[in-house]
Amino acid sequence: MWPESAESPAPLRTGLTTGTCATACCVAAAQALFADQQAASVSVTLPKGKVVDLPIIEYQTIDAGMKTSTIKDAGDDPDATHGATLFVELRLSPEQGVRFRAAQGVGIVTRTGLLLDVGEPAINPVPRKMMTEHLKGFAQTYHYQGGFDVSVGVINGEQIAQKTMNPRLGILGGLSILGTTGIVRPFSCAAYIASIHQGIDVARANGLTHIAATTGNASEDAIKSHYQLDDMALIEMGDFVGAVLKHIKKVEQADFAKLNSSTQLQTLSICGGFGKISKLAQHHMDLNSRASSIDLGALAKLAASLGADNALQERMTKANTSVEALSFAISDGLPLADAICQQALDFARQYIPAHIALEVWAIDRKGQFVGKALDADNSKRDEP
């Protein structure tokens, strides 16, 4: 079994990535082919050297090879692939090397900007390296001079992929085989954050100069309609605004250092519900309720700077929600949402290079814009 997470007083189980599962299937298939053993479980060495055991639920002889399957266990992480059946069809080949293919339920890359070339199966570099190293170990042990054809698949993967960012990223036909450490940390949301980074990379690589990062469906619909943006320009960041800001800073500054302006962004729009934007205005980079809360007193203080009297400030401080506090301010004719958007913009601005025009938009629960802040000067300066 794999270890429990130490971050929680009541330990949460860590899980294993799809890349680790695929590697286990490779190990099981190779063991069956070379040693004529069909073990109930196999051991896999993770990138940092830790060894984990995974159960193998199926062995099936195929032409020139073996098919093996395992069940993806994400531990206590809310992972879309948790419980999915992942399989590998491993075939021996007279041609040396290891070649990867997408079987049923694994996607194909159709857009530039990802870690893989267009036309490649969506099996990321670290899982490829893990599988290759384990297979080379078998080849060395058994003095095998040939190569391997590895087809990785996921039962119902095409349907599961609709719950992920893959279609928007241009990974079509199924899931991606992922992993960098081999382990899924509960609620680390590493895969989701990686998809945010990939969305930004794909948009930039395909020449888009304006992207919009949104907290949910309503904010996405609002900003998409306002600017008539292409789906590729829409980054569903959820609560992870920090992932957007930090990644844009990183990649844009890297291109600036290379004097490469061909992929640089010109405009970033951040759009979300008033409560989420209020958290950003209060310097929170994770907008989830478990990680941050709204300071109603700070909202009231901001309203005071706009002319709110003591009675209104007290009502706002005692409001049930930030949206209710906003409604009190609106009733008094105060542009609180615009002011919140401006505070959020001022905070986000420190992460976003100066050549990018920054916007922050807030919507109400009906998906209507209630506030906005735009860069006062959209002329681009010379340095990020």
Curated annotation (Swiss-Prot):
Pfam family, one: CbiD
Catalytic function, reaction form: Co-precorrin-5B + S-adenosyl-L-methionine = Co-precorrin-6A + S-adenosyl-L-homocysteine
Biological processes annotated in GO: anaerobic cobalamin biosynthetic process; methylation
Keywords: Cobalamin biosynthesis, Methyltransferase, S-adenosyl-L-methionine, Transferase
The keyword Transferase is annotated on this UniProt entry: yes
GO molecular function term, any single one: cobalt-precorrin-5B C1-methyltransferase activity
Similarity section: Belongs to the CbiD family.
PANTHER family, per database record: COBALT-PRECORRIN-5B C(1)-METHYLTRANSFERASE
Name of the featured protein: Cobalt-precorrin-5B C(1)-methyltransferase
Naturally occurring in which organism (per UniProt): Marinomonas sp. (strain MWYL1)
Species lineage: Bacteria, Pseudomonadati, Pseudomonadota, Gammaproteobacteria, Oceanospirillales
